[in-house]
């Protein structure tokens, strides 16, 4: 470190690490204050959301840190992008904001260069491949695309201009073809490390932020060890762009500052990203942008998603718990994964495990069954039935109104979807109690009340993105994706019905009732689920049909087949062991050890081993074990002989024997 280093940037010592530094002053935006509270990483707590409505109505700007595309997207990405997709939908579809949502793609970086060289392909081919895969994953997860997408490789001229301006403002310098941000000069006029003040001076984090191709070689070029690269001089084999400082490439942190500023300007309402990016990436973004604009606050609200643990551990390939989004979707549906994230607060650490996913799946089933029940009531009960409200209906309606108020307050409290969803679950439980009570008293549930509850829950689910497509206000339930014309929708169902009719007719003509039943079961278990229809047998002669998500039903079929496959394998293994045991019972005890010459060399008159293969006498402890095995064989062989004497065709089986 040079002698110009500021005390604010000295290496973090044990004493300094133990003292929590305060957050710098946050400037409350001018404008209309709302009831919405947001956990702002710039303050370390919840603050009211304020937006400037002059001339633009309820509009806001939002910049989201996108992925560095060098590998498959994993569950950590799902955690971040689903969480912020939910918040974006809430702010747009529930709170009524018009959002300009910009996300970047880092398509040139140290990690990309290293991976491309390892694979022997160009960095552009590698990044294009994984960018395509990323957006395929986002589509499968029902994550809305950004309004504008910024790729680093398409913004290099703007990045160069941005760096030039920072240099001219006195906060960056050129050194050996690279350009570095002057943290010492900046710290004299601004607050550096707004998001994580305690991480300022952490050499390890600072080095990680520079990238593995740069961190070590650049130390001697910097005025301070904590300065970071805005422009990197390219080494042989690295991509290059022209600049006033020679051929090179952008640094990691400057990319977001330049691209976000180009589209959203010098003051942005919301910036989002994962917690692991706070320092140095996001703190460096803030510093660069303030240095460029000469202002004190580039971002008004910085929001971060919490860490995702896998079975309580940090996800890594070395621990063999690295789970890609596609791998997760092989086991769970997109809706189940979103339900899982909704059940957790977006800004807190969470644990991904079979148990936690199991809870989300059970929660989903609760709502699925409720929607089926509500639809059946509305479908089968005419409005001509009594609709007078008794105290039971008044009480249930009160629960609906309370749930509406509570969900609203939870949403305003830092997007608390977890408690909002539990409130809806409680409303469903109360509604189910009411429906059962009606059945017991032989009265009909009041249709408009059931419809109002189901439609309200559906509306909140559409806000959270749990419905795969826009669900009309008159619709209830999760809905389904891809609503085409009637012919497109009915064709696969009519094909299945036609095939079913042909098979039943053929079996009926052949008077094969067993085949007819098998065809009916196949329709229920194999054909209709793939069309999004589930049939539940209520009795030997009646059944109830339900519309359900195709992927959910498909996975249920797969899970059922896996269970049956395991049962069959266990059965075969058990039969195999019984058969082996039975075959062994045919051997007289005197011959049990005789052929084991690889273990023993001498035997007594009963066939018991007396010496091992080396000619050493068997020890007493070994002899005791062999005697026990010998006695057991005597018992099994006697049972075998007894079975021969009582049967002339095949041995009578005992609990210790098996058929041949």
Curated annotation (Swiss-Prot):
Where does it localize?
A: Cytoplasm
Q: Where is there biased composition of kind Basic and acidic residues?
A: 627-639
Q: Which gene produces this protein?
A: cysS
Alphabetized SUPFAM superfamilies for the sequence: Anticodon-binding domain of a subclass of class I aminoacyl-tRNA synthetases (SSF47323), Nucleotidylyl transferase (SSF52374)
Its required cofactor(s), as named, are: Zn(2+)
The protein's name is Cysteine--tRNA ligase, cytoplasmic
Look up keyword Transmembrane helix and say if it applies: no
Polar residues composition-biased segments: 1-10
Record's keyword terms, sorted: Aminoacyl-tRNA synthetase, ATP-binding, Cytoplasm, Ligase, Metal-binding, Nucleotide-binding, Protein biosynthesis, Zinc
Motif 'KMSKS' region mapped to chain? 314-318
Tree of life domain: Eukaryota
Region described as Disordered: spans on this chain: 1-20, 563-584, 627-660
Biased composition regions of type Low complexity, renumbered to the chain: 643-660
Q: Which reaction does it catalyse?
A: tRNA(Cys) + L-cysteine + ATP = L-cysteinyl-tRNA(Cys) + AMP + diphosphate
Q: Which GO terms describe its molecular function?
A: ATP binding; cysteine-tRNA ligase activity; metal ion binding; tRNA binding
Family recorded in the similarity comment: Belongs to the class-I aminoacyl-tRNA synthetase family.
Give the principal location in a single coarse category. cytoplasm
């Amino acid at each position: 470190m040079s002698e110009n280093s500021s005390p604010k940037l000295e290496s973090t010592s044990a004493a300094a690490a133990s003292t929590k530094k305060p957050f710098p002053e946050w400037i409350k935006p001018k404008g209309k204050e709302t009831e919405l509270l947001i956990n702002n990483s710039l303050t370390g707590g919840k603050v009211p959301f304020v937006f400037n409505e002059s001339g633009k109505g309820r509009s806001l700007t939002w910049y989201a840190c996108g992925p560095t595309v060098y590998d498959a997207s994993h569950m950590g990405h799902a955690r971040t992008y689903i969480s912020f997709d939910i918040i974006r939908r809430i702010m747009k579809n529930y709170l009524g904001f018009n959002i300009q949502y910009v996300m970047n793609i880092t398509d040139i970086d140290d990690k990309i260069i290293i991976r491309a060289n390892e694979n022997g392909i160009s960095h552009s081919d590698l990044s294009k491949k994984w960018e395509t895969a990323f957006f395929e994953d986002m589509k499968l997860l029902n994550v809305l695309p950004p309004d504008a997408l910024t790729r680093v490789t398409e913004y290099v001229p703007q990045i160069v201009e941005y760096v030039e301006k920072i240099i001219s403002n006195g906060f960056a310098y050129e050194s050996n073809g690279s350009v570095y941000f002057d943290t010492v000069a900046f710290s004299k006029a601004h607050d550096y490390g707004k998001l994580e003040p305690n991480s300022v001076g952490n050499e390890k984090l600072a080095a990680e932020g520079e990238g593995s191709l740069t961190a070590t070689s650049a130390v001697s070029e910097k005025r301070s060890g904590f300065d970071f690269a805005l422009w990197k001089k390219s080494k042989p084999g690295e991509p290059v762009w022209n600049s006033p400082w020679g051929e090179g490439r952008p640094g990691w942190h400057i990319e977001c500052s330049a691209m976000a500023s180009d589209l959203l300007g010098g003051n942005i309402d919301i910036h989002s990203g994962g917690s692991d990016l706070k320092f140095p990436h996001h703190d460096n973004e803030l510093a660069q942008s303030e240095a460029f604009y000469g202002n004190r606050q580039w971002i008004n609200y910085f929001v971060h998603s919490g860490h995702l643990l896998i079975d309580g551990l940090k996800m890594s390939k070395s621990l063999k718990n690295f789970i890609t989004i596609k791998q997760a979707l092989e086991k769970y549906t997109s809706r189940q994964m979103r339900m899982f994230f909704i059940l957790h607060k977006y800004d807190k650490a969470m644990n991904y495990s079979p148990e936690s996913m199991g809870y989300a799946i059970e929660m989903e089933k609760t709502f699925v069954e409720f929607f089926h029940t509500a639809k059946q009531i509305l479908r089968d009960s005419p409005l001509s039935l009594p609709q007078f409200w008794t105290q039971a209906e008044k009480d249930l309606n009160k629960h609906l109104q309370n749930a509406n108020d509570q969900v609203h307050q939870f949403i305003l409290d830092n997007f608390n979807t977890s408690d909002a969803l539990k409130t809806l679950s409680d409303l469903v439980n109360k509604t189910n109690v009411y429906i059962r009570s009606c059945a017991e008293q032989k009265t009909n549930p009041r249709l408009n009340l059931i419809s109002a509850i189901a439609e309200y829950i559906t509306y909140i689910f559409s806000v959270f993105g749990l419905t795969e497509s826009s669900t009309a206000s008159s619709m209830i339930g999760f809905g389904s994706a891809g609503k085409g014309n009637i012919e497109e929708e009915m064709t696969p169902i009519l094909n299945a019905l036609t095939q079913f009719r042909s098979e039943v007719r053929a079996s009926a003509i052949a008077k094969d009732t067993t085949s007819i039943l098998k065809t009916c079961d196949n329709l229920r278990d194999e054909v209709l689920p793939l069309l999004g229809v589930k049939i539940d047998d209520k009795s030997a002669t009646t059944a109830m049909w339900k519309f359900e998500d195709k992927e959910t039903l498909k996975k249920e079929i797969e899970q059922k087949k896996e269970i049956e496959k395991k049962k069959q394998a266990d059965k075969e293994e058990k039969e195999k062991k019984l058969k082996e045991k039975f075959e062994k019972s045919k051997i007289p005890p005197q011959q049990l050890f005789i052929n084991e010459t690889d273990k023993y060399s001498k035997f007594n008159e009963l066939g018991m081993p007396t010496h091992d293969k080396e000619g050493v006498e068997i020890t007493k402890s070994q002899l005791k074990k062999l005697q026990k095995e010998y006695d057991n064989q005597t018992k099994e062989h006697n049972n075998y002989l007894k079975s021969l004497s009582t049967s002339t065709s095949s041995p009578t089986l005992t609990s210790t024997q098996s058929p041949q």
